[in-house]
Amino acid sequence: MASTYTPLGIELQATGENAGTWGTKTNTNLQIFEQISGGFTQQALTDGGTVALAVSDGATGAVMSHRMIEFTGTITGTSTVTIPLDVQTFYFLRNSSSGAHNVVFKYATGSGSSITFSGTQKGDKIVFATANDGTNPDIKEIPFIGAVVDDTTPQLGGQLDVNGNAIGDGTLEL
């Protein structure tokens, strides 16, 4: 049985294979794992085009195998960044591109959902590539905790159980 590769490029060595090179291959796998768990890289966007991020089976350096990807470059039209259909992971994405145009992050094919940095929106997003469908997988945005902290109109959708003192500075109606 020959070695196989995970969707993010880690080599799964077959029993008894790679005599004499096992240590080198294992070290490469550990470096790939390090990229996946916390690596940072930059990806220049193509002006109004598509950048296809690809896996490098058994090799380090694949942009899509890094945890954080920063998009750079000057764009004058919508730029799209794609990943292969079988990738299931989460990313920290940063849009540092110049130009007031959309940057779309999605799977390479299919009609699943994507995420978009709209026009002048720069900054960060946390996204989850679900690989939830063989032909139409979704990309989901995970909100930052700041969205909860900055909520000026919080609402409670159920009963509130207070185990201690309730402190307030307004009117309490029961």
Where do the PLM segments sit?
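Exposed extracellular interaction/assembly regions and N-terminal maturation sites
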Residues: 1-9, 16-103, 137
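Short beta-strand segments within Ig-like beta-sandwich modules, predominantly Fibronectin type-III
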Residues: 116-118
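Beta-strand repeat scaffolds of extracellular/surface proteins
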Residues: 31, 72-75, 86, 96-97, ...
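Intrinsic low-complexity, repeat-rich intrinsically disordered segments enriched
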Residues: 41-52, 111-113, 145-174
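Short clusters of hydrophobic/aromatic residues that line enzyme substrate/ligand-binding pockets
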Residues: 10-12, 167
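Tight coil/turn sites that cap or link beta-strands
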Residues: 86-88, 120-124
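Short, surface-exposed terminal/edge motifs of secreted or surface/virion proteins that either
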Residues: 30-39, 99-108, 113-114, 126-144
